[in-house]
Amino acid sequence: MAPRAHVLVAVKELHAAKTRLSSVFDTADRTGLVLSMLRDTLAVVSDVATVVGVTVVTPDPAVARLARSVGAHVYADPAPVSAEDRPDEGGTEHSLNAALSAAAEHVRRNERGVDVVALQADLPSLRGGEFGEALAAARTGGRSVVVDHHGTGTAALFSCDPEIPLDPRFGPGSAKRHLESGARPLDGHWPGLRTDVDTADDLDAAQALGVGPATRAALDALEHTDPSRCGNE
């Protein structure tokens, strides 16, 4: 059987998303940017040949509407939080991790033999070729991780064995937690995949690589309103 992957993208409630950009953007502008980066991320992964499905895991109705509008599935019900998750992560992160785990199990029940990927939602510089290469590298065995450009976070987590749970451990310092739990690091040169956006410096780094059309349009609109808020090209 040809390789097949289902991508899960978790998104917090918009009012809680990208708070580290609050010194640069107000809530409305930050929300618009989050949705634009999500739109670009979904567009790229949906066009990768071996991706057979994309599901957005979110409690937020606006995020769910966007996901459905571009053909993605939505897993809207937060999963129960287990006691084991509590020591390592804050409330929002452990709730999303539980929901990701439940969504991964749901996908595998309905799509036998599919690889499962948990991908960040804020990858405006992602290229399809990068993601395809990372998928191919992940398929050489088990559970694996792409560490972000800071070396501390997780850009993508892969489970390419139906007997191995996804076991997401997103949140601050997630790269270490994923590696310590047995995920192997994937070392490819994939700058767009590794550049998730949490801060103004991250946004500058993404713009230097080149961002997708929805993100570009959002940033152009913000720059027109106030050029000082959008960083350097």
Swiss-Prot record:
Its EC number is 2.7.7.105. It holds the Pfam family CofC. Keywords: GTP-binding, Nucleotide-binding, Nucleotidyltransferase, Transferase. It comes from the Bacteria. The lineage of its organism: Bacteria, Bacillati, Actinomycetota, Actinomycetes, Mycobacteriales. The keyword Nucleotidyltransferase applies. Belongs to the CofC family. This is Phosphoenolpyruvate guanylyltransferase 1. Guanylyltransferase that catalyzes the activation of phosphoenolpyruvate (PEP) as enolpyruvoyl-2-diphospho-5'-guanosine, via the condensation of PEP with GTP. It is involved in the biosynthesis of coenzyme F420, a hydride carrier cofactor. The keyword Transferase applies. PANTHER family: 2-PHOSPHO-L-LACTATE GUANYLYLTRANSFERASE. GO terms for biological process: F420-0 metabolic process. It catalyses: phosphoenolpyruvate + GTP + H(+) = enolpyruvoyl-2-diphospho-5'-guanosine + diphosphate. Phosphoenolpyruvate binds at T154, G171, S174. Gene3D superfamilies: Spore Coat Polysaccharide Biosynthesis Protein SpsA, Chain A (3.90.550.10). It comes from Rhodococcus jostii (strain RHA1). GO terms for molecular function: GTP binding; phospholactate guanylyltransferase activity.
